[in-house]
Amino acid sequence: MQLIPEKSLCEKNPASVVSKDKGESRKHCAINPNRKFDLRHYQLDGVLIQQETCCDFLLINDSTKKAYLIELKGKDIKKAVKQLQAGEKHCKSALGGYTFFYRIICSKAKTHQIADSAVRKFKDKYGMRFKIKETY
């Protein structure tokens, strides 16, 4: 997969990066205080990765060697976890030495979906590196 800076959706050190699908209200906002971090931002699902469904966006902080996999989802949290895993599988070799973080931004999830056993296992495995944010 080509994670070259020229294909990034943002400049090298933007003040903020917004991951948002066209026509949707869900979005993930990352703030770059004082523009001190070198960032790259890619749309994965359907753009860089077309052979299977995966998470929507990848945000890379080259300064801290952190990679954020981002899924914007309505209500199917279990599917969102699978899409994060697929995104990681495709990006892992290109980002050796980077620590992965996982973000789900959802708008219609019910408590029992967030408490699903597959979601809990993922949360137990990644701890504080995994976050779900509900938007309304």
Predicted regions and their residues:
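Short conserved catalytic/interaction loops centered on acidic-Pro-aromatic/His motifs
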Residues: L95-F101
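Active-site-adjacent loop/helix micro-motif of nuclease/hydrolase catalytic cores
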Residues: I49-Q50, D76-L84, H112-A115
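Solvent-exposed, charged helical/coil patches
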Residues: M1-K36
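Conserved catalytic cores of phosphodiester-cleaving nucleases, focusing on short active-site segments
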Residues: F57-L59, K66-G74
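Short beta-strand-loop-alpha-helix junction that forms the active-site gateway
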Residues: E71-K78, K108
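Domain-level recognition of nuclease-like catalytic cores that cleave nucleotide substrates
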Residues: M1-L9, F101-Y136
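Histidine-anchored nucleotide/phosphate-binding helix
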Residues: K82-L95
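Active-site metal-binding core of divalent-cation-utilizing nuclease and nuclease-like domains
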Residues: E24-D62, K79
